[in-house]
UniProtKB/Swiss-Prot annotation:
Reactions catalysed according to its record: shikimate + ATP = 3-phosphoshikimate + ADP + H(+)
Protein keywords: Amino-acid biosynthesis, Aromatic amino acid biosynthesis, ATP-binding, Cytoplasm, Kinase, Magnesium, Metal-binding, Nucleotide-binding, Transferase
Cellular component terms (Gene Ontology): cytosol
A Pfam family the protein falls into: SKI
Pathway: Metabolic intermediate biosynthesis; chorismate biosynthesis; chorismate from D-erythrose 4-phosphate and phosphoenolpyruvate: step 5/7
Localization annotation: Cytoplasm
Gene that encodes the chain: aroK
Keyword Transit peptide: no
Family (UniProt): Belongs to the shikimate kinase family.
EC number: 2.7.1.71
InterPro entries noted in UniProt: P-loop_NTPase, Shikimate/glucono_kinase, Shikimate_kinase/TSH1, Shikimate_kinase_CS
The name this protein goes by in its record: Shikimate kinase
Chief site of localization: cytoplasm
Organism (species): Baumannia cicadellinicola subsp. Homalodisca coagulata
Length: 173
């Protein structure tokens, strides 16, 4: 059985962090949090609005604060925003306060999973989504890899199967 330590999911948008996180929390009987949903709950506005009004820097500041507060809890599963790892403080907190699981996925899968989602501010630009996702991957993948304790390829399997694989890996560590 997996001890109740914090589990933090990182990775790009469309990797399945929220869906897999809910499955993990359910299977492990742990509390689930999504940093984007917490920001929306605290601001009373959706992420797109926060981006529009405060810009990416304002959003990242809120995100850093929310993740700091959530990672102080014990025995949680936390799905983080794809860009949360841009903050060194957030990377340090995630590494120090739990097991960091990097959900890696292909650009193709990201495109499929995000194409109808209008809540992704970084994909609302005039630049084609593929180019945006490729640029984000070049910038962020090294940061995900830097702090990951476990890396899982989250492409074809269901969230339930990926959660099962994560639990198996946690039991071995």
């Amino acid at each position: 059985m997996v001890e109740k330590r914090n589990i933090f999911l990182i990775g790009p948008m469309g990797a399945g962090k929220s869906t897999i996180g809910r499955q993990l929390a359910q299977q492990l009987n742990m509390e689930f949090f999504d940093s984007d949903q917490e920001i929306e709950r605290l601001t009373g506005a959706d992420i797109g609005w926060v981006f529009d009004v405060e810009g990416e820097d304002g959003f990242r500041s809120r995100e850093e604060k929310v993740i700091n507060e959530l990672t102080e809890k014990q025995g949680i599963v936390l799905a983080t925003g794809g860009g949360s790892i841009k903050s060194r403080e957030t990377r340090n907190r995630l590494s120090a306060r739990g097991v960091v699981i990097y959900l890696d996925t292909t650009i193709e899968k990201q495109l499929v999973r995000t194409k109808r989602d209008k809540k992704r501010p970084l994909l609302q630009a005039k630049i084609p989504s593929r180019e945006v996702l490729e640029a984000l991957a070049r910038e962020r993948n090294p940061l995900y890899e830097e702090i990951a304790d476990i890396t899982i390829r989250a492409n074809e399997q269901s969230a339930k199967v990926v959660a099962y694989h994560i639990i198996s890996m946690l039991e071995r560590n």
